[in-house]
Amino acid sequence: MAAVVVDANILIAARLSRDQNHERGTAITEAIDQGQLPTAYVLSDVLEAVINYLQARGGHDIAVETLDALIESSGFSLKQTPKSDFDAGRSVFRQYESLSLTDAVIVAAMQREDIEYLYSFDDGFDSVSGITRLTTPDNPFER
């Protein structure tokens, strides 16, 4: 089955109306949630980062609403990050100055799962070969 990975900044932008990428983030998350885009994996590290950020910036209610919406969505699939991805991510982190540790773990998971497409507004991923970053609600498998 075709799958993509979604970065924290997409989910955060969709939930915070003041975010500069709010409209694009909302369009992407709604298309995923409605099944117009492939299943989107959300790694547990990413989920924690999103919920913690939203709680700090938007309040507890928006954090809880987001958590529940992601869990209940048929378009998003929450994935526990295995230790092997964290270990591989540490190696990726050492190689790419443009990536945070969480971003590097995303890369490691994508490499392990052989997933090419990532919805993200972070251009730091552009330096990683084998990953195609998407910033609009387009289905990469229907090109």
Tell where the protein language model's regions lie, with residue ranges:
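Metal-dependent nucleic-acid phosphoesterase active-site entry motif
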Residues: 1-20
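Acidic, PIN/NYN-like endoribonuclease modules and their adjacent C-terminal/linker elements
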Residues: 3, 114-143
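PIN/NYN-family metal-dependent endoribonuclease catalytic core
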Residues: 3-6, 28-57, 80
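A general alpha-helix detector
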Residues: 10-11, 49-50, 88
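Amphipathic alpha-helical interaction elements
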Residues: 13-17, 55, 59, 94, ...
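Short active-site oxyanion
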Residues: 36-40, 75-77, 114-116
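Helix-adjacent hinge/juxtasegments
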Residues: 52-79
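Active-site neighborhoods of divalent-metal-dependent phosphate/nucleic-acid chemistry enzymes
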Residues: 78-116
